[in-house]
Swiss-Prot record:
Species assigned in the record: Staphylococcus aureus (strain Mu3 / ATCC 700698)
GO BP of this protein: DNA recombination; double-strand break repair
Family indicated by similarity: Belongs to the RecO family.
NADP in keyword set: no
InterPro entries for this protein: ARFGAP/RecO (IPR037278), DNA_rep/recomb_RecO_N (IPR022572), NA-bd_OB-fold (IPR012340), RecO (IPR003717), RecO_C (IPR042242)
SUPFAM superfamilies (UniProt xref): ArfGap/RecO-like zinc finger, Nucleic acid-binding proteins
Protein name: DNA repair protein RecO
Role, per record: Involved in DNA repair and RecF pathway recombination.
GO cellular component, one term: bacterial nucleoid
Keywords annotated in UniProt: DNA damage, DNA recombination, DNA repair
Length: 250
């Protein structure tokens, strides 16, 4: 059966000498794996069209199991996401988070909206690292956990100015007054905790201007990755390249 669906490539894996297996997140919020034959060959024209983040109309044959890609009518190549290694790595982290949050057969229209929103924001100049944080905050429940940043997990104190870190012992933010009860709590700035809470709760269609200092973004990114490792046992492939790039800077 010949299928035509709009979608965004969220995963691309080399298969053999000349083929690729791509996964698109289609406009209905479903993951669709496709075999792209000879996609690594320049002459086929599919090499550029099967890159990560390509948004387009995908035409493919679907019978049982994996479909076979025929062609792609590209709507947006998202070139800016490919031009900078840092940008590309954090955009990949966002895409990987969404891809791994979904089981085979899942239908999640919100994930498609989230991915489109994030890629458009990055293209317009918003920090890709910040956008990866937004995605990971929005996808937490799909990985089976949540996190609270707006009140002390020990005392219930919800005075934002008193919160100084995150406690894995008590599974939540911890206040200055209770800090002695967990000497291993991850110390965070008050602003980091506040913004994590805001971004977690704020609908994406209300996120207009996102201007946050890099130090705060770094703190948010670090604690979010720690949460995913601790609560979901997740380590993302994209994170390996990010870690390598950070080591090169040191």
């Amino acid at each position: 059966m010949l299928m035509r669906q709009k979608g965004i490539i969220i995963k691309a894996v080399d298969y053999g000498e000349s083929d690729k297996i791509i996964t698109i997140l289609n406009e209905h919020g479903a993951k669709v794996p496709l075999m792209a034959r000879r996609a690594k060959k320049v002459k086929t024209g599919l090499q550029a069209q099967t890159q990560l983040f390509v948004y387009g109309l995908f035409i493919y044959n679907q019978w049982r199991g994996m479909g076979t890609l025929n062609s792609v009518d590209v709507i947006s190549q998202h070139y800016k996401l490919q031009m900078d290694l840092y940008v590309s790595s954090y955009a990949s982290l966002a895409a990987e988070t969404i891809e791994r949050s979904m089981d085979e057969g899942d239908i999640a229209p919100y994930n498609y909206q989230l991915l489109q929103f994030v890629l458009e924001k990055i293209e317009s100049g918003t920090s890709a690292q910040l956008m990866s944080v937004v995605v990971m905050l929005k996808c937490m429940k799909r990985f089976g956990f949540t996190a609270s940043f707006n009140r002390c997990a020990v005392s219930g104190n919800d005075t934002q100015a008193d919160l100084i870190g995150y406690s894995f012992k008590f599974d939540g933010a911890i206040s200055r007054q209770e800090a002695s009860k967990d000497v291993h709590a991850v110390i965070l700035s008050n602003k980091t905790l506040y913004l994590l809470d805001v971004l977690q709760k704020l609908p994406i269609d209300k996120m207009n201007s996102l201007n946050i200092h890099q130090e705060i973004i770094d703190e948010m990114s670090d604690i979010i990755l720690m949460l995913y490792r601790e609560y979901a046992g997740m380590f993302f492939k994209s994170q390996k390249l990010i870690n390598q790039l950070k080591r090169l800077e040191q």
